[in-house]
Amino acid sequence: MKRDVLSITDLSKEEIYELLESAADLKAKRKAGESTEYLKNKSLGMIFEKSSTRTRVSFEVAMTDFGGHALYLNSRDIQVGRGETIEDTARTLSGYLHGLMARVMSHDTVEKLAKYSTMPVINALSDREHPCQILGDFMTIMEFKKKFEGLKFAWVGDGNNVCNSALLGSAIMGMEFAVACPKGYEPKAEFLEQAKALGGKFTITDDPKVAAKDADIIYTDVWVSMGDEAEQEKRLREFASFQVNTELLGVAKPDVIVMHCLPARRGLEITDEVMDGPNSVIFEEAENRLHAQKALILKLMR
C-alpha cells in the first residue's frame, strides 16, 4: 500500500523508533562495508525547486547503496514550469519510478504530487516542514543522549519549517521544546495547536537564555533562508542577539549538544568556537541525514 511522508506527524512514535533502529543498522553495515542492495532495479525521482548540497547527495548515495538509481530533476528538467500541471507530472512519473522525493517552495506542490501519484512521496523540504532533517536529528539525539523522554530541546532563531518539524517531532517523542525567536518570527499558531494536541510541552520566548536554560539540546538555523534574501538587512538586525555562542551555552547543561541543519553562516547564528567545539554534533548530524533517509526510503519503497 502506497505511503507518503509529508510531515513528521505522518509517522507514529513507534514508527520513528523503528526507523531510528533501521538507520543505526544501515549505518553500521555501511561502516563495515556490507552490501545493502535492497532496492536493486528501483528508481527514485528527486524534484528540486530549491537547491541543496546535503539533500541531493544523501538521497543519491542512499539509492546507490541500495543498488537502485536516483534521478535528479530540477525545474528546468521537467515541464511543470512550462505549463504541465503537477497532477499530470505526478501521474506520468508514477509510470516510470518507484518513489519520489520533492524539495519544493510550496507545501501545496508536494501534497499534489502525493495525491496524484501511485508511488510513495517524501517531503525533502517545503515551506511548512522538513521531516527528513528531523529524522536525522533524532538519530543524532539518540546516539548522544540515548533517549528522548524528559530532554529539553531549545530552538534559538527563526521559527521556520525546520522549527515546525522539530516542534511537532518533540511533542511526539516526549521532549520539552523551548523556542526563542524575535517577536514576529515565532512558529505559526496552527503548529503550536498541533503540538498541543499531540501532548507537547513547549514554551515561546524572545529571550535565548530563557530557552537555553538547562537545555540538553540547543539547535539553530540560518537567519536568512533561501527566499528571504529581500529581508536580509532587517533579519540580521532583528536576530543579532540570537547567536549561539559560548555565553549561551553557559546557561545550558554542561553536556548540552549543539545542532544545526546546515548550511551555517559562521559568525552570525553560530560562532566558530561553538560550531567546532566539544559540544557540537553538527557534522555527525549531517552524516545521519543519509542513514535516517535510507531507513525511510527502505520503509516506503521496499
Swiss-Prot record:
Looking at the keywords, is Translocase present? no
Looking at the keywords, is Amino-acid biosynthesis present?
yes
Ordered alphabetically, the record's keywords are:
Amino-acid biosynthesis, Arginine biosynthesis, Cytoplasm, Transferase
Q: What does this protein do?
A: Reversibly catalyzes the transfer of the carbamoyl group from carbamoyl phosphate (CP) to the N(epsilon) atom of ornithine (ORN) to produce L-citrulline.
Q: Which InterPro entries match?
A: Asp/Orn_carbamoyltranf_P-bd, Asp/Orn_carbamoylTrfase, Asp/Orn_carbamoylTrfase_sf, Asp_carbamoyltransf_Asp/Orn-bd, Orn/put_carbamltrans, OTCase_ArgI
What parts of the sequence cross the membrane? none
**What name does the UniProt record give this protein?**
Ornithine carbamoyltransferase
Q: Which residues bind carbamoyl phosphate per the record?
A: 52-55, 79, 103, 130-133, 261-262, 289
**Signal sequence bounds:** none
Q: Which superkingdom does the taxonomy of this entry point to? A: Archaea
What cystine linkages occur within this chain? Answer: none
Q: Where located?
A: Cytoplasm
What GO biological process, any one, is recorded here?
L-arginine biosynthetic process
Q: Which GO terms describe its cellular component?
A: cytoplasm
Per the record, the pathway is:
Amino-acid biosynthesis; L-arginine biosynthesis; L-arginine from L-ornithine and carbamoyl phosphate: step 1/3
Q: Which gene encodes it?
A: argF
Listed EC numbers: 2.1.3.3
Concerning Pfam families, the annotation shows: OTCace, OTCace_N
Family (UniProt): Belongs to the aspartate/ornithine carbamoyltransferase superfamily. OTCase family.
Q: Which Gene Ontology molecular function entries are recorded, alphabetically?
A: amino acid binding; ornithine carbamoyltransferase activity
Q: Binding residues for L-ornithine, per the UniProt record?
A: 161, 221, 225-226
Which reactions fall under this protein's catalytic activity? Answer: carbamoyl phosphate + L-ornithine = L-citrulline + phosphate + H(+)
> SUPFAM superfamilies, from UniProt?
Aspartate/ornithine carbamoyltransferase
